[in-house]
């Protein structure tokens, strides 16, 4: 057949025609065949439908809705019995089907957690599955749901004809759970365990404590489902809960529309007959057929489920989120545990998902309108039907230019809006455009048509020019130029950039018509850290690591070789030859000095205990020493005057000389004549050569040179034992016939005269001095000290420079500490014990691969001790430096660390400088001192001391002149520094002992650690006394008092002997004095207060196999006293825990408190003390307004949280037998009556409620037997807890119920996008009543307190004021009388205090409460290292280094600019002062108080009399010296700052706004807002010096830096009117020329060191205020702990959504951030009573008008309303008051009416610094 015919027959038209014709003829074959096919299809469909699971949704639905459900869920047979008529029936039906679909997708034998599910529905099932529902009651609707489900389930049970045993058990269990939860709720018990049940609990899934492992065999898998319940659950919280409960898969659903992603504020949800509305950060769901309440959820949380793919849980597990399908408006999702990928090495992944928008038939159409308020063109976009827009475009383009009119287009659009003309007839369409949009559509189309026609003409012209046959050179060049540079001119381009910057829209794109995207692409990625990282955080392969190790080892070997060569050239103090590395031993050796042997012995053995026992050993090798020195020593005995190279000042008495003589005579044959050799032949000393076999031995045989003198005993009854390093055989044997002192001398001779062996000699070897040789540590003198005859000296030094990263001249150079660049030369090696220098912190010790926890902990503890010494010595250097530089000049003022100085420069008996003697406040004399001279103070040495004793007085060696001074050798000059650091310094001998132990005492097996974890007072000490056998066991404890108590009890209860009692020691005493004891078991009392390494050291040294630790896991643990390091292994690894929960000390209410607050988990604490009640609280509302509210009760123990509070309490209690300790110091002690005090209202991490407060609360509450009274200035957690205990019934106290506060959920932040950015007019409404009500809402009750006569009562009444020792009062001044001053009467009643009048009482109160109450830093801080690292970081983070200007500061122009800014009065005062620079005392300041009292903006008691702010200011001539320089430096700093770092120089809100305009309001941030307390008064030397180092970057020279530092160190302030003089140490004087700048940069640099500011996106600093933004989601640790422990700042961190800075809120207004002043500060000041005349009122009005301009925008007031509600925790909206406030400050007449004034406005000019 022809192919064309076949093709026609097989075409669709022919086939359709045939089928239609044949199928309609009844009886035809084709008709019958088609009927059979259709019948078969119907039968198959019916059979398949029967196999589907039937679901009766029971809702009243129509046929269309049922058909829609069948289409959405084809795997189910959906029917309805229509027995329920409820709200949003379609949504409820879909929820039921979704529940069934997801439930059946899990295995039947698993356990399912249904989040927010209907437990009643699950309980009715008969499929054998088990479901636990988490149904928290977060609002009233949740409570309603619970009641509905209860009724539904009870009706199900009642209606059942037969209830199976299984269902009956389920019903009984549900009833039991309901009753238990209800009973607990009535008791206010809301703990997770209290709300737990079997089939359901009332906890959030994140807090659910149901344990599914209790079901069956405990191996059932857990799954999760969440049907429309995840809207408000943060995704990370959800997966973290899944990880905790081991839920591997979770499936769920939520309502979603693609319109949400494209930004539509309102959209339809047709499948559930509903709609959504986005309102700010919330999304609201409602239903058209539902009169009931809708649902409101967190939009930000919901969007995470749409946008995220990879989610990392809190514990590290990674979960994969998949959007599985979209059924109608319901999104199905699955979260699966994908952590196995990480195990397999997958560290990063990415995903892309496309969400279809289903908008193919729509286009984005631009519309324009006119804003009525601003008359500006406004723009918006609408989605219009593509068909309508195409018709409109076709019609508009076919019209001629004169036919395109608005009327014609609107007429056409109106007639064809929802109709289309086909064949001359109109047919309706489904979509219709809103008729209100037609005029705007017409406008857009007219402009669009005109632009397209103009564009068509341009294209036509260009095309014609291109198709010409002839070419021209000009045309080609023009085309190339336009192609490269564009046709637009440079001017137009610039205007374009400016327009874009100003957000000015223009061009053809304004009227562009675009298609809606088909889908929205969402990307997500995850990147996990590698498991292998080095200390710097960079990932390295094994080959790279091997290469680096080999390079490091080669470097160390070369460095060691060169060090040995240099030392060999310089060491001349041993009796043997020293062969250089790589040199033949046959070469002539270097000559040695004459006194070497004796100097070695004296330096090493000068201070020894007299009880040491030593074995005599035969001399194995000839002893070599100086014959001259030997003869002199025998004949005269004056060798003890030799200079000691270690800085140990030797103090010898007759008894020691006699012992030396006896020892010498007894051992003369063995030591001197029989086998002695002299290396200094008197006749021919120059020709002496050493033999080859006398070369130095290997380093393994070396003994360490360490001071072993009169070490301090920690325990007074501990007998001293020698610290000489002996072999075990020598130390264990004894010779009873030999005098101990003689044995000691013999052993010393053995060590001194035998061949000296050195180990690990490096360039940082110790300084050794003698009469003939001096080896200097400083690298800059190293070349000069090398032997001139050795040609290798210079080459060796050069080689050293080449090998090391630092030149030789900087290895051990003592720094010029006035410059940071010079401080970088500080020694970076381990300091010897007596070196007192700046040094960098030692590097953290490396960890070997095979190290166990014990080894790591011991190594870390050694490192901690070294760091502690480095930090302490750096502090000592700072104190010496301040002394040498003249910073200290008065003994009346305190000094750092209670430092004082004893000078032997002029007085041989010694003279205390400034008349200040050192006595430790509780322990007496110091064990160490730092000796230095003025000329060479950088070579200071730490020496051990001997003080007055009875024998010295008998011998006449003590006199009244030196009875309070240590014993120093005759002829020793210099200055001795004593302070709290040098008092004990046990770290030095302990470190020496432990380093030896770490190398030699290695136990193969780690001891087994058992912790007796007992509550306070449980009898831990009693357990030790009963269980410890002192014959073969050992007992150590942390505190001396505990050790003494244990010894007494062992003696009385166990009849222990004196020898046995020596096995009960403090840990320090054991490490210092006992090296020989061994024990199988070590009992360690309060072991948790010690570093784990210390415990392991004690155990290993004792060879103990078991350690029984007594401790309390909830009390204060080991505290790291070196702030700049982080400890990883400080906590013990416990093998076994024995719990003791019975206390014999604490009363019943304390036991109940410990139980209720779950300090010990679920354990119940019981007490044997029958006392029922012992707790009492006194808070700010109970009269605790100041420290004077605390009663002085003899015999009571006073406890404080902070050391500064302890000192304040001691001053308050005065002289007498008062017991005051910190909570930390009191741990382990017991008292009858305790007063616990919190004297500060500001937050601290150890205050109750703080991050680390729990141990301090436990210790503080459990010290007493009879009573505890808690006095607190803040109503903190402990205050409320103890107050709550007072209301507990006595019967309940015996039951120890649990209690915890109600948990609340915090919503996240989602900002609304705004298009318009125009100011909105504020309505002129409101009255005086609105202002008063606004104030009373925030501060109820504050306005009714009258304080008018408070100042009068203080000035005239009897007042007892304790004067600090640094205060002096001269009573011969004329007393100022209080005068009554009244002004205008304010109509507003606020808590604005009256102005105070200066007087004696006011001045003393201000000094005592402010300047004299400054906190003191307790931690060890290495200031040198902190300053260096902080300044280096500041250069990178704060400044553009290319703009740092360090040129000369002192210029005539700069001084002139500063001069013109001064007032005429100040200029006259400076001109009248003719003192020269040498006559000016920069440390002397004037003192006054501010009359204005800072008003309280909180609910703290108004009855407390607030101390006035103090002003400490220098003479004008001092400001003339520093003022121009500081002004220029601050100008240079401003220029060099990076754009995102803002320095607020007292700018107004309008001036600050440009600084934040670069911030995007659509981008969320993590904000840090710090509030400092007593900022000026908390300054230490660290603040002063770090700011000076910063200023040096900008040109501050050394002389001015010195004078500036001196002016802020020890200062004298004088109140010349009232006769008060005070001495102040390290405080920022509030009236000097750079107070604001110094405060700003002190705060900025401290925050830089404490926070990762390099990641900050915005930061602004001004005075003590700061505001910092970090990227959203970044985890930021609270810096307050570090600011307190390192920078001495008492502060708290604010976490507000609406941030504040310098009294101004940073708010989002339109498209920008703006600053707006705090309205409540203004409102409070409107209650002033001292405004006297119209002029001052006009000045105030003008100032308010300048500063509050932003209130003219209604949007600002709206944002402020939200901000103040959050900041002041208002219970309602205060917009009415803000409107009234704006109204009253915009009109002078209304403003004057606030003060009952009717005068006229006086035009005045107000300066920037005007304050009212």
Curated annotation (Swiss-Prot):
Residues 1010-1272 are annotated as: Helicase. Residues 720-733 have a biased composition (Polar residues). Residues 79-306 form the Alphavirus-like MT domain. Residues 979-1140 form the (+)RNA virus helicase ATP-binding domain. Residues 1565-1678 form the RdRp catalytic domain. GO terms for molecular function: ATP binding; ATP hydrolysis activity; mRNA methyltransferase activity; RNA binding; RNA helicase activity; RNA-directed RNA polymerase activity. Residues 1141-1303 form the (+)RNA virus helicase C-terminal domain. Its EC number is 2.1.1.-, 2.7.7.-, 2.7.7.48, 3.6.4.13. Residues 543-573 form a coiled coil. It comes from the Viruses. The replicase large subunit is translated as a fusion protein by episodic readthrough of a termination codon. When readthrough of the terminator codon TGA occurs between the codons for 1303-Lys and 1305-Arg, this results in the addition of the RdRp region. Heterodimer of a large and a small subunit. This is Replicase large subunit. It comes from Potato mop-top virus (isolate Potato/Sweden/Sw).
């Amino acid at each position: 057949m022809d192919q064309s015919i076949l093709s026609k027959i097989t075409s669709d038209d022919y086939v359709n025609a045939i089928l239609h014709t044949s199928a309609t003829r009844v009886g035809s074959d084709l008709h019958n065949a088609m009927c059979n096919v259709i019948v078969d299809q119907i039968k198959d469909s019916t059979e398949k439908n029967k196999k589907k699971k039937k679901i009766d949704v029971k809702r009243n639905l129509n046929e269309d809705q049922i058909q829609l459900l069948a289409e959405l869920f084809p795997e189910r047979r959906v029917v309805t019995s229509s027995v329920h008529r409820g709200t949003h029936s379609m949504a409820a039906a879909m929820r039921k089907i979704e529940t069934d679909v997801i439930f059946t997708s899990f295995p039947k034998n698993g356990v399912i957690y249904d989040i927010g599910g209907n437990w009643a529905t699950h309980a009715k099932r008969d499929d054998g599955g088990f479901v636990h529902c988490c149904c928290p009651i977060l609002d009233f609707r949740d409570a309603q749901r619970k009641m509905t489900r209860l009724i539904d389930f009870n009706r199900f049970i009642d209606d059942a004809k037969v209830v199976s045993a299984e269902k009956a058990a389920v019903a009984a269990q549900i009833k039991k759970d309901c009753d238990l939860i209800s009973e607990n709720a009535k008791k206010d018990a809301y703990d997770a365990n209290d709300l737990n049940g079997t089939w359901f609990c009332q906890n959030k899934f994140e807090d659910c404590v149901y344990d599914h492992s209790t079901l069956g065999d405990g191996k059932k898998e857990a799954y999760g489902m969440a049907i429309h319940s995840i809207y408000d659950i943060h995704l990370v919280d959800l997966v973290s809960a899944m990880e905790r409960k081991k839920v591997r898969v979770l499936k769920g659903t939520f309502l979603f529309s693609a319109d949400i992603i494209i930004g539509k504020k309102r959209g339809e949800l047709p499948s559930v007959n509903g709609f959504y509305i986005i309102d700010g950060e919330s999304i609201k769901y409602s239903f058209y057929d539902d009169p009931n309440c809708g649902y409101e959820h967190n939009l930000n949380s919901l969007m995470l489920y749409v946008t995220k793919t990879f989610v990392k849980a809190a514990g590290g597990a990674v979960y994969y989120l998949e959007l599985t399908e979209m059924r109608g408006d319901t999104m199905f999702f699955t979260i699966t545990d994908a952590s196995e990928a990480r195990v397999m090495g997958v560290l990063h992944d990415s995903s892309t998902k496309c969400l279809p928008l289903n908008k193919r038939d729509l286009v984005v159409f631009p519309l324009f309108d006119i804003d009525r308020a601003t008359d500006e063109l406004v723009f918006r976009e609408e989605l219009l039907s593509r068909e309508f827009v195409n018709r409109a475009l076709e019609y508009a383009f076919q019209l001629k230019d004169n036919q395109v009119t608005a009327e014609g287009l609107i007429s056409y659009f109106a007639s064809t809006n929802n109709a289309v003309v086909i064949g001359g007839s109109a047919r309706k369409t489904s979509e219709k455009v809103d008729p209100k949009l037609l005029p705007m559509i017409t406008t857009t189309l007219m402009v669009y048509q005109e632009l397209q026609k103009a564009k068509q003409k341009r294209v036509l012209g260009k095309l014609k020019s291109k198709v010409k046959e002839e070419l021209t050179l000009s045309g080609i060049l023009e085309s190339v130029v336009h192609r490269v540079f564009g046709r637009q001119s440079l001017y137009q381009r610039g205007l374009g950039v400016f327009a874009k910057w100003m957000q000015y829209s223009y061009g053809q794109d304004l009227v562009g018509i675009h298609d809606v995207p088909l889908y929205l692409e969402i990307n997500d990625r995850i990147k996990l850290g590698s498991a292998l990282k080095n200390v710097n955080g960079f990932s390295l392969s094994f080959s790279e690591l091997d290469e680096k190790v080999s390079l490091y080892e080669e470097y160390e070997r070369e460095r060691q070789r060169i060090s040995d060569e240099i030392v060999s050239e310089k060491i001349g103090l041993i009796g043997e030859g020293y062969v250089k590395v790589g040199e033949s031993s046959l070469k002539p050796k270097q000559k040695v000095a004459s006194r070497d042997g004796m100097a070695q012995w004296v330096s090493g053995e000068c201070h020894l205990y007299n009880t040491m026992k030593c074995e005599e050993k035969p001399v194995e090798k000839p002893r070599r020493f100086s014959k001259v020195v030997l003869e002199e020593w025998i004949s005269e005995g004056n060798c003890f005057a030799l200079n000691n190279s270690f800085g140990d000042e030797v103090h010898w008495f007759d008894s020691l000389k006699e012992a030396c003589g006896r020892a010498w005579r007894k051992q003369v044959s063995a030591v001197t004549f029989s086998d002695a050799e002299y290396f200094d032949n008197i006749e021919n000393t120059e020709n002496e050569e050493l033999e080859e076999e006398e070369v130095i031995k290997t380093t393994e045989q070396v003994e360490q040179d360490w001071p072993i003198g009169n070490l301090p005993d920690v325990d007074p009854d501990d007998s001293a034992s020698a610290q000489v390093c002996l072999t075990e055989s020598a130390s264990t044997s004894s010779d009873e016939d030999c005098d101990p002192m003689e044995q000691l001398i013999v052993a010393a001779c053995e060590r001194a005269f035998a061949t000296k062996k050195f180990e690990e000699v490096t360039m940082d070897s110790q300084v050794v001095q003698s009469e003939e040789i001096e080896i200097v540590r400083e690298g800059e003198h190293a070349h000069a000290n090398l032997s001139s005859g050795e040609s290798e000296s210079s080459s060796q030094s050069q080689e050293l420079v080449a090998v090391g990263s630092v030149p030789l001249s900087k290895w051990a150079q003592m720094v010029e500490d006035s410059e940071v660049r010079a401080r970088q030369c500080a020694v970076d090696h381990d300091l010897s014990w007596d070196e007192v220098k700046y040094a960098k912190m030692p590097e953290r010790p490396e960890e070997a691969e095979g190290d166990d926890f014990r080894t790591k902990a011991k190594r870390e503890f050694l490192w901690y001790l070294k760091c502690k010494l480095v930090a302490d010595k750096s502090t000592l250097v700072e104190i010496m430096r301040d002394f040498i530089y003249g910073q200290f000049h008065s003994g009346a003022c305190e000094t750092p660390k209670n430092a004082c100085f004893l000078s032997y420069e002029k007085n041989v008996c010694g003279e205390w400088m400034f008349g200040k003697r050192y006595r430790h406040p509780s322990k007496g004399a110091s064990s160490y001192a730092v000796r230095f001279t003025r000329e060479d103070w950088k070579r200071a040495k730490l020496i051990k001391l001997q003080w007055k004793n009875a024998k010295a007085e008998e011998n006449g060696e003590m006199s009244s002149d030196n009875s309070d001074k240590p014993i120093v050798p005759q002829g020793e000059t210099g200055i001795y520094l004593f302070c709290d650091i040098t008092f004990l310094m046990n770290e030095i001998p302990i470190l020496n002992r432990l380093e030896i132990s770490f190398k030699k005492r290695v136990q193969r097996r780690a001891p087994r650690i058992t912790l007796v974890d007992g509550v306070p007072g449980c009898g831990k000490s009693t357990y030790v006394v009963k269980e410890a056998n002192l014959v073969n066991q050992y007992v150590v404890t942390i505190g001396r008092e505990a050790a003494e108590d244990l010894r007494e009890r062992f003696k009385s209860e166990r009849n222990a002997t004196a020898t046995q009692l020596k096995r009960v020691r403090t840990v320090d005493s054991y490490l210092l004095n006992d090296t020989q004891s061994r024990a199988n078991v070590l009992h360690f009392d309060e072991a948790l207060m010690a570093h784990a390494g210390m415990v392991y050291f004690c155990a290993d040294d004792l060879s103990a196999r078991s350690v029984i630790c007594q401790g309390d896991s909830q009390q204060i643990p080991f505290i790291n006293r070196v702030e700049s390091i982080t400890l990883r292994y400080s906590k013990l690894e416990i093998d076994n825990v024995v719990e003791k929960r019975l206390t014999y000390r604490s009363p019943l209410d304390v036991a109940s408190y410990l139980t209720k607050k779950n300090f010990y988990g679920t354990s119940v604490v019981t007490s044997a003390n029958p006392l029922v009640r012992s707790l009492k609280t006194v808070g700010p509302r109970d009269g605790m307004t100041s420290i004077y509210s605390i009663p002085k009760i003899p015999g009571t123990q006073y406890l404080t949280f902070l050391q500064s509070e302890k000192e304040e309490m001691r001053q308050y209690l005065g002289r007498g037998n008062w017991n005051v300790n910190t909570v930390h110091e009191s741990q382990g002690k017991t008292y009858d009556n305790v007063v616990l005090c919190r004297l500060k209202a500001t937050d601290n991490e150890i205050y109750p409620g703080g991050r680390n407060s729990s141990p301090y609360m436990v210790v503080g509450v459990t010290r007493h037997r009879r009573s505890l009274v808690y006095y607190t200035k803040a109503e903190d957690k402990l205050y409320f807890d103890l107050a709550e205990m007072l209301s507990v019934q006595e019967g309940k106290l015996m039951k120890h119920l649990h209690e915890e506060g109600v948990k609340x959920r915090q919503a996240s932040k989602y900002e609304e996008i705004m298009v318009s950015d125009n100011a909105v007019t504020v309505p002129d409404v409101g009255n005086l009543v609105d202002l008063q009500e606004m104030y009373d809402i925030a501060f109820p009750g504050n306005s009714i307190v009258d304080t008018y006569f408070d100042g009068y009562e203080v000035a005239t009444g009897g007042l007892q004021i304790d004067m600090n020792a640094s205060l002096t009062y001269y009573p011969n001044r004329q007393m100022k009388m209080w005068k009554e001053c009244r002004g205008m009467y304010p109509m507003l009643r606020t808590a604005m205090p009256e102005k105070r009048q200066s007087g004696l009482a006011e001045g003393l109160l201000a000094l005592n409460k402010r300047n004299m109450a400054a906190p003191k830093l307790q931690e060890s801080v290495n200031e040198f290292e902190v300053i260096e690292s902080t300044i280096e970081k500041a250069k990178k983070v704060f400044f553009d280094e290319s703009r740092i200007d360090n040129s000369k500061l002192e210029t005539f122009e700069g001084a002139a600019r500063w001069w013109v800014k001064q007032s005429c009065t100040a200029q006259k005062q400076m001109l009248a002062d003719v003192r020269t620079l040498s006559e000016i005392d920069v440390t002397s300041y004037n003192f006054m108080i501010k009359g204005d009292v800072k008003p309280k903006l909180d609910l703290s008691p108004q009855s407390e009399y607030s101390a006035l702010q103090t002003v400490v200011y220098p003479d004008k001539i001092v400001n003339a010296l520093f003022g121009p320089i500081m002004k220029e430096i601050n100008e240079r700093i401003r220029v060099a700052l990076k754009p995102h770092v803002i320095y607020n120089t007292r700018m107004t809100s309008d001036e600050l706004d440009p600084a934040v305009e670069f911030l995007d309001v659509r981008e969320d941030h993590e904000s840090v807002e710090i509030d400092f307390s007593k900022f000026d008064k908390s300054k230490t030397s660290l603040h002063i010096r770090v700011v000076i180092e910063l200023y040096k970057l900008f040109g501050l020279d050394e002389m001015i830096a010195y004078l500036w530092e001196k002016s802020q160190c020890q200062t004298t302030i004088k109140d010349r009117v009232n006769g008060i003089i005070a001495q102040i140490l390290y405080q920022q004087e509030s009236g000097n020329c750079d107070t604001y700048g110094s405060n700003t940069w002190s705060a900025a640099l401290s925050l830089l060191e404490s926070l990762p500011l390099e990641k900050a996106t915005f930061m602004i600093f001004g005075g003590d205020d700061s505001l910092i933004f970090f990227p959203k989601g970044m985890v930021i640790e609270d810096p307050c702990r570090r600011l307190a422990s390192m920078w001495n700042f008492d502060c708290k961190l604010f976490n507000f959504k609406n941030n504040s800075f310098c009294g101004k809120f940073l708010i989002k207004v339109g498209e920008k951030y703006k600053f707006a002043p705090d309205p409540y500060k203004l409102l409070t000041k409107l209650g002033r009573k001292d405004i006297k005349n119209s002029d001052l009122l006009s000045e105030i009005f003008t100032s308010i008008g300048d500063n509050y301009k932003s209130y003219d925008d209604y949007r600002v007031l709206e944002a402020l309303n939200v901000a103040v509600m959050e900041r002041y925790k208002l219970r309602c909206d205060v917009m009415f008051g803000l409107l009234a406030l704006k109204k009253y400050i915009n009109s002078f007449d209304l403003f004057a009416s606030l003060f009952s004034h009717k005068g006229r406005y006086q035009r005045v000019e107000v300066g920037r610094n005007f304050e009212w």
